[in-house]
């Protein structure tokens, strides 16, 4: 590199570093863009003079560089423009110029060609056309630059350009779905991200309007309030993107888990632990994109209508205040929302009641939104407003869209201050993937779908139950309030009771309705906790659950709310196994509440009799049956449900001395049930768990049982890896049975060591602190319940079993609750030593070491 260029490069580095230092000190986005853009232009000036002095070419900044929005590691978008086709010599010179840019670490993105060639290249390329919309002359022949701009503008079909940009935005939003896009969003391309702001400005500029927000305000495209909010949202997002680049030291636009704490810290979220810093950063981010989405919903249709040929206008009278224009509702006088604030809810009520109205007309939406910022205590205390708000839930029709609309435009938070506290609040707990407000509205949607016959195919039984449930509006409200107290510290289920009861009192619910609502909010986690963590075949567990529930109405409501909550937390959580657990508990509790639960001795006797009847029908002699029951022992019937007993008995009755393995695919499920019967020995349970983990199975539940003649009868529910199709299941089943058969007949099976385990990036950078509780079982001396919460990983259950074995603790039952990347496991164990506090403390410490 020539000496003069080396000097220019050194000057650039100094100016770049100064721009970054000034930014980190003053925290002003516009100053950083101005200083960094100037630094790049200074370097380009030296390079241009070196390669193209006195040339007919010109250099133009395009794209982000053209609009002066250059981030620390962004591409530098350039165009080298010639009045005539490029000769071979000029092309070689341009190639050397571009290579020098790379040598300077500028990451150039360069288009080159004649005016005609460049115009032709973007004729059917919306991305290229958009880049040249931002074109800005830098150096060289200005006449060539002016000619290019003139020809580009002349060939651009503005209406087609606007439509193409809106379609592009729709496709971009569609790609930003799924848990990854929510948890690690792309700050540029996500809905409400920087690219949406750019799209608004491009649409305006293509129409010959202003190129920045202050000018759009002067041209009355934006109101002062809208310009202020959009500027604020833009600055928030730009700050985050600058810090992302500086911390990642690359052009990284995703808020990755490993970068979130670094960005949060560098942005000044001090005095909080790393997780809280990250949550606060994400909350700022979600609120910023929400602002952009609000304004985009208002401005996009207004800008579009300026150039698009509107469909034939069909106007219908609704009442004295409103008309219907095609599929939109419009106010006859847009100041109605300021003069008569009760119309803030009335227009939404009309939209909810009429299926042929899907939106507010843009000018009406703008006026309505402006008025909503005046919602205050007086508005809340107005009984007409309260009746209408409660009516949204009683009506049910279009409830999800109504609540999402009100949330998007900030109305829910202004009407209910408790709601405002959860907007954008993300929980780094390894299984929630949505901000709390989005999660709640997804749960409301799930409850509502159960009430609609068109969705009955998804969950037929739950849908039928919901469609016959009398108090559907209370169930919608329970979904709305179940997590409203998140983020306050303490038990959100308990804290939410006061919010629910206050709402009920203010919105004319009866005492009975208020009681049901408050009970559901308080107990919304009860059914999932019992079904997933406890042995629902244990009569004591069922008895305790039913004492909390008490009525069939509560049971049905809790069942429907629980299903909807799990499905709305994370798509990965809902599966056939969880569905079967909840349904089994629902039916068992229903029988109990009807008086058909029976006492434990009757229940165990009935289980044994059902198995005996099956064997008798299969012509198994009574004497042979009795031998089997004696070998299994009386405790067997207390620890297994009827379906398991029938399955075990059919496979063991003819020979309960020979080791066997059996498996079956559970009905309508992606899971196997596996039984292993063999002579007892050391570490068998742990070694079996390792076999399942090595095959990629998730262990959903496990029951370890030792017979009277010292055989193990272990039963597992394992989930098939998600990448396998149902047609693969028989082959997977055969391969698993073959390895298990080798194991039970004494053939050595290589054991995979747990140190090879892998966990996700989310688990690495947003881990949860492991916790362990050990509680003695009432009425059962030397039996203990062990509860473990930790980051989920392969071989976790096997490692826990190894620890139990090393401490002379006999594992009898394991209930595995895997919540995406979070494991909440419950174990029932037997030990003569755990009553000693030192031994119990030693067990806890060893378990924590395995979990950390």
Curated annotation (Swiss-Prot):
Keywords: Hydrolase, Magnesium, Multifunctional enzyme, Nucleotidyltransferase, Repeat, Transferase. Its EC number is 2.7.7.59, 3.1.4.-. SUPFAM superfamilies: ACT-like, HD-domain/PDEase-like, Nucleotidyltransferase, Nucleotidyltransferase substrate binding subunit/domain. Uridylyltransferase (UTase) activity is inhibited by glutamine, while glutamine activates uridylyl-removing (UR) activity. It catalyses: [protein-PII]-L-tyrosine + UTP = [protein-PII]-uridylyl-L-tyrosine + diphosphate; [protein-PII]-uridylyl-L-tyrosine + H2O = [protein-PII]-L-tyrosine + UMP + H(+). The keyword Membrane does not apply. Residues 673-757, 785-852 form the ACT domain. GO terms for molecular function: [protein-PII] uridylyltransferase activity; phosphoric diester hydrolase activity. It comes from the Bacteria. The keyword Nucleotidyltransferase applies. Residues 436-558 form the HD domain. GO terms for biological process: regulation of nitrogen utilization. Modifies, by uridylylation and deuridylylation, the PII regulatory proteins (GlnB and homologs), in response to the nitrogen status of the cell that GlnD senses through the glutamine level. Under low glutamine levels, catalyzes the conversion of the PII proteins and UTP to PII-UMP and PPi, while under higher glutamine levels, GlnD hydrolyzes PII-UMP to PII and UMP (deuridylylation). Thus, controls uridylylation state and activity of the PII proteins, and plays an important role in the regulation of nitrogen assimilation and metabolism. Has four distinct domains: an N-terminal nucleotidyltransferase (NT) domain responsible for UTase activity, a central HD domain that encodes UR activity, and two C-terminal ACT domains that seem to have a role in glutamine sensing. This is Bifunctional uridylyltransferase/uridylyl-removing enzyme. It comes from Neisseria meningitidis serogroup A / serotype 4A (strain DSM 15465 / Z2491). The lineage of its organism: Bacteria, Pseudomonadati, Pseudomonadota, Betaproteobacteria, Neisseriales. The gene is glnD.
